[in-house]
Amino acid sequence: MKSRKELEIALSQVPKFRNPKAELEQHVTPADLAATILWTAHLAGEIEGKIIADFGCGTGIFCRGAELLGAEECICIDVDMDALDDGKAFLSRSDVTQADILTCPLRSIDVVFMNPPFGTVRRGIDKEFLTTALAKAKLSVYSIHLASEATERLFRSIALEYGFNTETVVTLYRMPIEYPWHRKRIHYMPVQVFKFKKSAQVISRT
């Protein structure tokens, strides 16, 4: 991949959810947003040669991008086998696993990418995803969340407890949320993208 735009074009081929499940708060990560996040990590040296995981991966857009950017290994985890089956054809080197990331045992991971449930159906699930990712990642976590000052304050505080500093990768993005049974086919929700980076002091002690 020579550019973020080239990566975006490649990621646009990753399938969407055929039958999105509202109870899982499944929302597609748009190719342009995924490319921005992945390219940011790539420029920081956090993909090539690294072990990457996508928590709640859906059809696997982050793992597909990580493959293209030279990750050593990609782990694609989701509870929804339908979504995993849809994405398998586009994943050449990823370990695709049906599991609940909140309870499944995980080995060493360098960087986690995720577009987790926002917590509108199951309150607090976004926080559970984040704490799980922070507990597993050796270097960084890139995560998409609803844009909210209160949420940002909470997540920055949680990150510090785990020894991570917080950076904003994308300040505001209007993410399309599409469910076939909605009267209005596409809704837009404001989201932010955070990078939680383990502090150098913590890394040096591990």
Feature roles, as predicted:
Residues T59-A71:
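Conserved SAM-binding loop of SAM-dependent methyltransferases across substrates and taxa
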Residues E73-D78:
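Conserved SAM-binding motif I beta-strand of class I
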